[in-house]
């Protein structure tokens, strides 16, 4: 099916439910459909830089919108967690962050920060020539030497240079790291990871995070490491 009923689209999408019966179904891409938003919806219903889908498609088709430094002409392209959006005609830059109200939302960032992205390591696999492939949350795959690859652990985060794809830094998932929740009832809350209760699967462990206002608990799999003592990228206005 190429269309999606508005009534069944994710609740956090800012689309009018009582309007036209159909919405935009995200194209297959780096983020799951239930945790991403089509580029045209972002442009029309979030940024309000287009009044209609036709206008949004025209803007996108002309190559005026970049995602993670690359021009995207597919109006259905799925935009998700930590993606960097660039609106080239007006030199505006945004990062998609977790939000307690809207699940995901863009925040304005400086051009100096638009060239980096924090990505979580979802898996590690051995590939040819003794190399290790890091599989990141946004579908990105990065090949590293075996010796270097040993230091990277799943659920840890890497800082990626969007211009050349190289790794700039690494933050393991461990106590005293700065994390942000991107799913669950605490989505959008962030703070210092205190510890977690051991479980058979590390991803299922219950973690305790010390936020600015209070502590909260969530599944370890719902956390993204975004720095050591503080975030390395902007996550608040």
Curated annotation (Swiss-Prot):
Keyword terms, alphabetized: Ribonucleoprotein, Ribosomal protein, RNA-binding, rRNA-binding
Molecular function (Gene Ontology), one example: rRNA binding
Top-level division of the source organism's lineage: Archaea
S-S pairs: none
Entries under InterPro entries matching the protein: Rib_uL2_dom2, Ribosomal_eS4, Ribosomal_eS4_central_region, Ribosomal_eS4_central_sf, Ribosomal_eS4_KOW, Ribosomal_eS4_N, S4_RNA-bd, S4_RNA-bd_sf
One Pfam family, short name: RS4NT
Cellular component terms (Gene Ontology): cytosolic small ribosomal subunit
GO biological process, one term: translation
PROSITE patterns attached to this UniProt entry: S4 (PS50889)
This protein's record includes keyword RNA-binding: yes
Keyword Ion transport listed: no
S4 RNA-binding domain residues: 37-100
Family the entry assigns: Belongs to the eukaryotic ribosomal protein eS4 family.
NCBIfam families found in the cross-reference section: PRK04313.1
Protein name in UniProt: Small ribosomal subunit protein eS4
Species of provenance: Caldivirga maquilingensis (strain ATCC 700844 / DSM 13496 / JCM 10307 / IC-167)
